[in-house]
């Protein structure tokens, strides 16, 4: 691996499999992180990305605040983080924390830092990756399982306060928060155990069904509610936008529970309830399915797992074809009925008789879903009622227009909120939290 020491987030890192690949890869690393020192590392395959959270003061004290697992990555950038680490043996994990503390002391580090490792499940061994000299965006994972406010600790450390006088760290070691007696931070047994398990998911403006290709554009709506088990934040809001030069991540969700499986379930619920509508695509549906896979639940994935799934073109499940067709026909027909109504009223406002060709009661919607063409006859049977006909079969639905431009469609006793977004390749439908595309018939 060729890696720029100033790089991060997937930038400034390349894998080379032969000497012939080195010159070109080296130039790419140089171009992505200009001026950075570049070093070569042995490639560790089938590894987990584990990291230890550190706090170090001005007096030579270093405390490790548990560990995190950040192995679910695409293009070397984290997508899912969790803590504490569950895949490594406790003795090995304790040794990793000890080495991390020793490293920080050896360079007289002060502040919050993360020491990152590549861990081999087969060998129960690990390799040093890097010391990240900053507070990382996934720090709430550690805060939730430890009760330690890491940014607040940074402020106190900068003021010269020793670690053993910081109330949160004293609580972590079972001490009186108001006390000042010394603490042996090398004695891991004195530290309270982690409080439950936390799963974190980065929300990115990427099309997960197209190799996590970045997307940009306006955001009409972001709907997410925090609760005692789930917390999240977003760097933009409805009415804002993600531009093409920004980092793809614009949100982060965290779910906590007593066990790892319960935390996964809490995150699944949170992702299903998350609603993001606009020109961008997001990874939320994809990750929701990803964390329910056998490999993730079984804790047997590695850092190359997600990239392999992308290469194998594993995509998210789409809405049932019949629901996509019905909702697609409803969206297309309501658009045409509204256009005809405007045209009809235009004639009346001019004192003219509207021509007979303007029908506000029937139309035909034709589109392609999953490479299949559908031609649906639509008849308006009431102010909010449509009858759809396809291949001799018919279905009645109730359609109500929403204030935000969406439709509330009632079908067979179930309600579906549907929004649409026009794109160069067709119409993107958001049915609840699932997405499908309506394409025009391809030219021969």
Summary of predicted features, one role per range:
Residues 56-98, 133-156:
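ATP-dependent carboxylate/phosphate-activation module, predominantly the ATP-grasp catalytic core
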Residues 17-18, 56-61, 120-123, 226, ...:
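Short acidic-glycine loop/turn motifs at beta-strand connectors
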Residues 240, 435-444:
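Short beta-strand-turn/beta-hairpin segments enriched in glycine/proline and small hydrophobics
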Residues 140-389, 393-396:
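Catalytic cores of soluble metabolic enzymes centered on carboxylation/carboxyl-transfer
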Residues 13-14, 42, 88, 249-258:
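Short, well-ordered beta-strand elements within core beta-sheets of diverse protein domains
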Residues 41-44, 50-56, 108-137, 174-175:
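Conserved metal-phosphate-binding beta-hairpin within the catalytic cores
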Residues 382-385, 391-407, 412-416:
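Conserved nucleotide-binding/hydrolysis modules and their immediate coupling elements
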Residues 2, 15-45, 75-83, 89-90, ...:
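Conserved ATP-binding module of the ATP-grasp superfamily
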């Amino acid at each position: 691996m060729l890696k720029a020491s100033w790089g991060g987030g997937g930038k400034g890192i390349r894998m080379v499999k032969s000497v012939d690949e080195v010159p070109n890869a080296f130039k790419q690393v140089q171009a992505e992180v200009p001026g950075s020192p570049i070093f070569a590392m042995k490639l560790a395959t089938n590894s987990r990305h584990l990291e230890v959270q550190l706090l170090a003061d001005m007096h030579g004290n270093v405390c490790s605040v548990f560990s995190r697992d950040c192995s679910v990555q695409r293009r070397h950038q984290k997508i899912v983080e969790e803590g504490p680490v569950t895949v490594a043996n406790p003795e090995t994990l304790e040794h990793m924390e000890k080495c991390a503390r020793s490293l920080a002391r050896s360079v007289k580090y002060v502040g919050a830092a993360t020491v990152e490792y590549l861990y081999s499940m087969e060998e129960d061994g690990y390799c040093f990756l890097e010391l990240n000299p900053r507070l990382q965006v996934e720090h709430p994972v550690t805060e939730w399982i430890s009760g330690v406010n890491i940014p607040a600790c940074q402020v106190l450390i900068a003021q010269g306060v020793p670690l053993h006088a910081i109330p949160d760290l004293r609580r972590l070691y079972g001490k009186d928060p108001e006390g000042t007696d010394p603490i042996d931070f090398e004695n891991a047994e004195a530290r309270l155990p982690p409080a439950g398990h936390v799963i974190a998911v980065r929300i990115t403006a990427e099309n997960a069904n197209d190799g996590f290709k970045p997307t940009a554009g306006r955001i009409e709506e972001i709907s997410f509610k925090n609760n005692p088990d789930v917390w999240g934040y977003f760097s933009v809001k409805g009415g804002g936008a993600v531009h093409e030069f920004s980092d793809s991540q614009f949100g982060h969700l965290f779910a906590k529970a007593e066990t790892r499986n319960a935390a996964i379930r809490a995150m699944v619920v949170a992702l299903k309830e998350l609603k993001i509508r606009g020109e961008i695509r997001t990874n939320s549906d994809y990750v929701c399915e990803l964390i329910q896979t056998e490999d993730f639940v079984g804790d047997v994935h590695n850092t190359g797992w997600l990239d392999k799934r992308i290469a194998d073109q594993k995509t998210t499940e789409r809405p049932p074809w019949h629901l996509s067709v019905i909702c697609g026909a409803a969206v297309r027909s309501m658009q045409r009925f509204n256009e005809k109504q405007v045209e009809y009223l235009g004639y009346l406002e001019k004192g003219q008789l509207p021509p007979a060709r303007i029908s506000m009661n029937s139309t035909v919607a034709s589109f392609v879903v999953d490479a299949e063409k559908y031609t649906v006859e639509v008849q308006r049977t009431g102010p909010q009622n449509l009858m759809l006909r396809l291949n001799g079969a018919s279905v009645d639905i109730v359609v109500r227009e929403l204030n935000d431009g969406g439709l509330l469609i009632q079908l067979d006793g179930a309600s579906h909120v549907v929004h649409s977004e026009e794109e160069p390749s067709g119409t993107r439908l958001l049915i609840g939290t699932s997405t499908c595309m309506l394409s025009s018939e391809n030219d021969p």
